[in-house]
């Protein structure tokens, strides 16, 4: 038994999740009536539901509190590029939804009719009311819009606080992230239960739906990396951006793909910036900041999964509402890339815009974890490589103007 536990701990999380997917599928086919196996998935999703509101609050507030006033203009350009690039990726995901609409196989509760908003006006009204909710109530009721708003307010207010106070907030963020890491380490068992429950109820045909979901996610992220980001870079630099784009992808994406954490990839990106001859005073700030707020891949994941849930429930979405969704996903993604699987925990924030219950939203998160072996790796590769790309683009753009 000790040998088994030791070997299990030495195996990467990606491989363990893959093992869980295979075992869950086999058990779902062979013994579909042993429903107690599905309890593993319910417990896993329950743990995520419990920690998700606090995670959003802590990560966003900490990220914003660390930004400093009076940064040189080059740093401001980088931050604008980070936010605009994330928003552009979110809009790309919306467009891909209209071209390749997909639906998900959710549990029995998905039959419950969601309160579909009647156009952008109602969405805006609900958004405003949720934003001013009591922060404690927002945390306890999983009102992610309220959680996000108050996290932003506290984060900006903390910018002028003492370093000791900021350190307390940073510690809270680290502790919350550690709890999430513990839960994520149980993902193989949770995924086993989720796959078992899905296969036992819907059969192997549901795997085709997951295949389409993976193709849409990865295809959209690839389009952002090879089309959207180069367009942004060309506009800023006025010259061929692809040598810089490919250098960023080549040197940053491999480690990011396997660590599935932009935070863990910071040393690699710092070395790459040094190799590119960039200003260390700039990239020493922009790369760590980018690992927290530069979230193109996360925005794609949030929008694709949310709009898939919306399609599944038969909710009509006009482009104006989808535009608001892109704004919300851009803001809510702040802090997601610092931990493995973080963007999936922010899907309920976007789902709440459409009146989708937290229970249904967490089922969508469960689907995200099933495809997460590929999704999270590709997402992090896009996020992390873009940190370097936009840092370099901002600096080269400044040289062009000088």
Curated annotation (Swiss-Prot):
It comes from the Bacteria. The keyword Cell membrane applies. InterPro entries: Na-dicarboxylate_symporter, Na:dicarbo_symporter_sf, Ser_Thr_transp_SstT. Keywords: Amino-acid transport, Cell membrane, Membrane, Symport, Transmembrane, Transmembrane helix, Transport. GO terms for cellular component: plasma membrane. SUPFAM superfamilies: Proton glutamate symport protein. Disulfide bonds: none annotated. It is a multi-pass membrane protein. GO terms for molecular function: neutral L-amino acid:sodium symporter activity. The keyword Metal-binding does not apply. It catalyses: L-serine(in) + Na(+)(in) = L-serine(out) + Na(+)(out); L-threonine(in) + Na(+)(in) = L-threonine(out) + Na(+)(out). The chain crosses the membrane at residues 17-37, 44-64, 78-98, 138-158, 179-199, 212-232, 295-315, 336-356. It is found in: Cell membrane. GO terms for biological process: serine transport; threonine transport. Belongs to the dicarboxylate/amino acid:cation symporter (DAACS) (TC 2.A.23) family. Involved in the import of serine and threonine into the cell, with the concomitant import of sodium (symport system). HAMAP family: Ser_Thr_transp_SstT. PANTHER family: PROTON/GLUTAMATE-ASPARTATE SYMPORTER, SERINE_THREONINE TRANSPORTER SSTT. This is Serine/threonine transporter SstT. It comes from Streptococcus thermophilus (strain CNRZ 1066).
